Every structure is written in structure tokens, then in C-alpha cells.
Amino acid sequence: CLSRGLGDVYKRQIIITFRCFLMIGRVPSESMEPTLMVHDWLIGDRHAYEEEKPQRGDIVMFYQKDENETMVKRVIGLPGETVSFVGGKVYINGEPLDESAYLDDTVETDCGEEDKTFTVPEGSYFMLGDNREISLDARYWKHTYITTDDMKSKEILIIPFHRLPWF
């Protein structure tokens, strides 16, 4: 009976430790496809940005004020940069952004307005979904930019349970 009680204590301790350091989320929409598919599970590091700053390309879970919900998007624009959209491509400070590490060359990005430019304030970040045709992201939010205070975790693991044959 004592060993069973200790087992419960250890289980609780593991859960508490896990929740303090990691965040679990589930992808609710197609906005990050093909990188993240609907119903994929994510594990994120809650403390990733305490010592380091977000980097372009990071996938982040964050609180979005306009939608009053937690979202998952990719960091595109860094503090002090200008982000613009020309001919279906993303430009950072006037240079085309190489997104080949995570997007197909055929992906087009626009804002509904050609040549729209955003200047990212200090301490803020510009976020986009990978599925640019349908993603509700910084191009359309009233509160365009996200701060590290809004960021809940940096994604460190994608678990595609629904795509695995034994689930």
C-alpha cells in the first residue's frame, strides 16, 4: 500500500514538473500546414525565451489579443525590421526572405494589398502562418505585433498522433 502511495506521489511530481517546463497544445486549424497538420500535438518549451530571443523561423504558441485565444504561428519579422509583401513574396528590410527550409517555392504571400509594409517595433515580433492563403495572422490583426510576454512556448516537438497507423 505504501509503494502505491509513493507511485501516486511520483506521478503527480512528474506531471507538475512537466507542466512547469513544457506546454502541450493541439493544432486547431490548417493555418500552419504543411508544417503542422490539423490535430497534430505540440510540445513547447515554456522557458525558451527567458535567456534567448525568438529567432526568425521559430514556431511559437502565443496569446493573441484580437482573437482572445492561444495561436501557433511562425516568427517572421524581428524587432526593428520592415516586413513587406511584393509579388506574393515576403521581404525583410527590402530583401526577399528565403523560406525554403519550411515552405514550398510555390507558396505566395500577400495582404490583399500589394506593397504593404509593416515596421516591427522594438520588443515585438511579426508572426505568419505557413498556409498563407488561409492563415489569420499579423497581416490582418488589429494588434499586429506579438511580444515575448505574449509568447507561451517555443515548439520543440510535433507529435502527429492522428497520422500514425497505430492510433
What are these regions (language model features)?
Residues I16-M32:
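Aromatic-capped interface at the extracytoplasmic side
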Residues S3, S29-S31, S135:
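Short linear Ser/Thr-Pro motifs
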Residues C1-Q13:
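Single conserved hydrophobic/aromatic residue that forms the stacking wall/gate
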Residues K11-I14, S29-S31, K142-I146:
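Intrinsically disordered, low-complexity boundary segments flanking structured domains
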